[in-house]
C-alpha cells in the first residue's frame, strides 16, 4: 500500500498481503473473474472496483468511523481518501448492467480528502494513536476494543489509496450526484458514540 501511484488505474493489480481473509477472498474472486474475462471473450464480464462506499445503511469500517463521535487516527498520518455515496454506487451498478462493456473499471469521484479532514467535516473528534513501533497501535486498539479501526487495515490508514475513476465515467457517462459535502453532512447529523 505504501508504494501506490498517485492515481491507481485499472491496470494496477489488487494487493492483499497482510489483509483479512475476507479481503484476500475478494482479491481472489476478482482474479478468477479476470481469468474468465480474458479466457472467454464471448462472456460479458464487467468488474467494478469502488472506492470507500459510505452513506445511510452502510456498515463497513470507514462508515462506522465517520459516524463516531470520536475516531482513532494514527499520529502523523492522514492519507488521502475517496468516498462514494451508496446511492451513487447503486447508479454505477445499474449503468454497468445496462451497457454491456467488458473490462475492469474503478468507480470513484474525482475528488478526495485527507482522512483526518474527513473526520473533522463529519464532526468527529480524533483520538491520536501512536504509530510506532508497529506493535503499539495494535495493542492500543485491542485494549480500547476499537473494532472499527481493525489492525489489518493499519496500512490503509497510513498511506493514500486514491483510484482513478475516469475510465468508468467516460465509458458509462457516470457522474456521482452526491458531493462530499452531502456525504459528510449525513455523518455529522447522525453521530454514534464510541
List each language-model region with its residue ranges:
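Mid/C-terminal beta-alpha module of Rossmann-like enzyme folds, strongest
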Residues: 90-152, 165, 181, 185-188, ...
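Conserved SDR Rossmann-fold cofactor-binding beta-strand/turn motif
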Residues: 49-50, 54
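Active-site Tyr-X1-5-Lys
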Residues: 2, 18-46
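N-terminal Rossmann-like NAD(P)+-binding domain of SDR-like oxidoreductases, especially those catalyzing
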Residues: 1-18
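Alpha-helical membrane-targeting segments
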Residues: 60-83, 125-161
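Substrate-positioning beta->alpha
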Residues: 25-29, 58-62, 74-97, 102-103
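Short aromatic-enriched loop/helix-cap "lid" or pocket-rim segments at secondary-structure transitions
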Residues: 2-6, 57-62, 117-120
Amino acid at each position: 500500500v505504501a508504494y501506490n501511484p498517485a492515481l491507481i488505474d485499472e491496470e494496477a493489480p489488487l494487493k492483499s498481503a497482510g489483509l483479512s481473509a475476507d479481503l484476500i477472498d475478494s482479491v481472489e474472486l476478482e482474479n478468477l473473474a479476470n481469468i474468465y474475462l480474458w479466457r472467454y471473450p464471448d462472456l460479458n464480464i464487467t468488474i467494478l472496483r469502488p472506492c470507500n462506499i459510505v452513506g445511510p445503511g452502510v456498515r463497513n469500517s470507514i462508515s462506522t468511523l465517520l459516524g463516531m463521535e470520536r475516531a482513532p487516527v494514527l499520529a502523523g498520518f492522514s492519507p488521502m481518501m475517496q468516498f462514494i455515496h451508496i446511492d451513487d454506487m447503486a447508479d454505477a451498478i445499474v449503468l454497468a448492467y445496462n451497457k454491456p462493456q467488458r473490462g475492469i473499471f474503478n468507480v470513484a469521484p474525482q475528488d478526495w480528502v485527507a482522512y483526518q479532514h474527513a473526520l473533522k467535516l463529519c464532526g468527529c473528534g480524533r483520538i491520536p494513536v501512536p504509530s510506532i513501533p508497529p506493535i503499539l497501535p495494535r495493542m492500543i486498539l485491542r485494549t480500547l476494543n476499537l473494532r472499527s479501526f481493525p489492525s489489518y487495515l493499519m496500512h490503509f490508514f497510513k498511506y493514500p489509496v486514491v483510484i482513478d475513476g475516469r475510465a468508468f465515467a467516460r465509458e458509462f457517462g457516470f457522474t456521482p450526484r452526491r458531493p462530499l459535502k452531502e456525504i459528510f453532512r449525513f455523518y455529522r447529523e447522525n453521530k454514534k458514540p464510541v
